[in-house]
């Protein structure tokens, strides 16, 4: 098995606990579905949020996923880059897998599709 990174990101319209958790959970569920990821294969998960999000830690959404309570998770603040995407939540999931790197399915939803138009799933913003 190899260690691979699975990337994902989404945006919210409002800085509310409900929307941040809902959009983060939606993103995580799509990453899990697309990559057939099981909690026991996840080494760690890093989540970041842009500085304009304060209502809740996005990592709280991981705890709402059945069986994911033992996955090591941490949150951090994304760099505040001039012209950068606002109200954005990013995920880096480190997993053990036999899947070749070029077959990992990264997931970019909502306004984030502009960040990685080269990846196939960025074309699909509907779940």
Curated annotation (Swiss-Prot):
Intracellular or extracellular location(s): Cytoplasm
Signal peptide positions (record): none
GO terms under cellular component: cytoplasm
One of the GO BP terms on file: amino acid biosynthetic process
One Pfam family linked to the record: CM_1
Enzyme Commission number, as recorded: 5.4.99.5
InterPro entries: Chorismate_mutase_AroH (IPR008243), RutC-like_sf (IPR035959)
PROSITE patterns in UniProt: CHORISMATE_MUT_1
Record NCBIfam families: CM_mono_aroH (TIGR01796)
Protein name as catalogued: Chorismate mutase AroH
Natural source organism: Bacillus subtilis (strain 168)
Gene that this polypeptide is encoded by: aroH
């Amino acid at each position: 098995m190899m260690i691979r990174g699975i990337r994902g990101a989404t945006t919210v319209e409002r800085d509310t606990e409900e929307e941040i958790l809902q959009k983060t959970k939606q993103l995580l569920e799509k990453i899990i579905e697309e990559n057939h990821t099981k909690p026991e294969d996840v080494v760690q998960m890093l989540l970041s949020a842009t500085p304009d999000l304060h209502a809740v830690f996005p990592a709280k959404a991981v705890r709402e996923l059945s069986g994911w309570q033992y996955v090591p998770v941490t949150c951090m603040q994304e760099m505040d880059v001039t012209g950068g995407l606002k109200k954005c939540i990013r995920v880096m999931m480190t997993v053990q897998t036999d899947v070749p790197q070029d077959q990992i399915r990264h997931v970019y939803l909502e306004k984030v599709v502009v960040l990685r138009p080269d990846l196939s799933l960025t074309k699909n913003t509907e779940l």
